[in-house]
């Protein structure tokens, strides 16, 4: 079944110009078309249509893979009263008894939080087997990291760098992997400034390998 994802504005990445009322058609795990909604819908009249508010962009790469998944603990919701809801690092992490099973569960929760920020891949070497397994099961891609990222680790790939540097790969051409995200930010002005100002926490949908893996309710 082919699905068209349409948004108020599409930023294809790379050298592509913004497309007001843009859309991406997805067949299986691959992109079938990218462009104005009217053209994409005319080419695929039988497709199911999902409409999203805001800006549709390429999927994001978080540069802090090891820091967020192997050097931080993401508490289970059942531990919230004791540990809170935010990732634990430093002395708070050192005080925990961390088994392989606990690292794996933490990484799964961390990966889900990444998906909720439009992330489709992480950069940096992951060395814990339980963490690698969790990342693989969730479906996040893994990218090589050639230098240490600047600034504190963040779940927001837009934080501390130009928005376009967070994009993993430009959208398209036909046959490319269907990895993208949608952010509910204003589209009346500079969309890049809006993404930086409001951040990846505004993500309303993440598509990874053609699957809708996150949808904000």
Task: Label the predicted regions.
Residues 117-156:
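Active-site loop-helix segments enriched in His/Asp/Glu that coordinate
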Residues 59, 151-158, 192-194, 216:
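Short, charged, surface-exposed secondary-structure boundary motifs
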Residues 94-116:
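Alpha-helix-centered segments that form part of catalytic cores
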Residues 1-43, 162-199, 207-217:
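N-terminal metal-binding scaffold of metallo-dependent hydrolase/deaminase domains
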Residues 79-83, 87, 97, 144-161:
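Long, charge-dense
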């Amino acid at each position: 079944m082919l699905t068209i994802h349409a948004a108020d504005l599409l930023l294809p990445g790379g050298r592509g110009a913004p497309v007001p009322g843009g859309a991406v058609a997805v067949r299986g795990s691959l992109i079938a078309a990218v462009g104005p909604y009217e053209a994409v819908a005319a080419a695929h009249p039988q497709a199911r249509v999902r409409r999203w508010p805001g800006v549709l962009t390429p999927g994001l790469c978080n540069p802090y893979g090891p820091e967020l998944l192997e050097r931080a603990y993401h508490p289970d919701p059942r531990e919230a009263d004791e540990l809170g809801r935010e990732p634990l690092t430093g002395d708070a992490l050192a005080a925990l008894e961390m088994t392989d099973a606990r690292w794996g569960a933490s990484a799964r929760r961390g990966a889900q939080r990444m998906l909720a920020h439009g992330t489709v891949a992480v950069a940096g070497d992951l060395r814990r087997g339980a963490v690698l397994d969790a990342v693989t099961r969730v479906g996040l891609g893994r990218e090589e990291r050639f230098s240490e990222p600047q600034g504190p680790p963040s779940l927001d790939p837009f934080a501390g760098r130009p928005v376009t540097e967070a994009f993993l790969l430009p959208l398209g051409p036909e046959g490319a992997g269907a990895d993208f995200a949608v952010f509910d930010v204003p589209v009346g002005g500079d969309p890049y400034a809006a993404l930086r100002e409001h951040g990846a926490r505004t993500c309303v949908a993440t598509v990874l390998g053609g699957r809708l893996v996150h949808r904000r309710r």
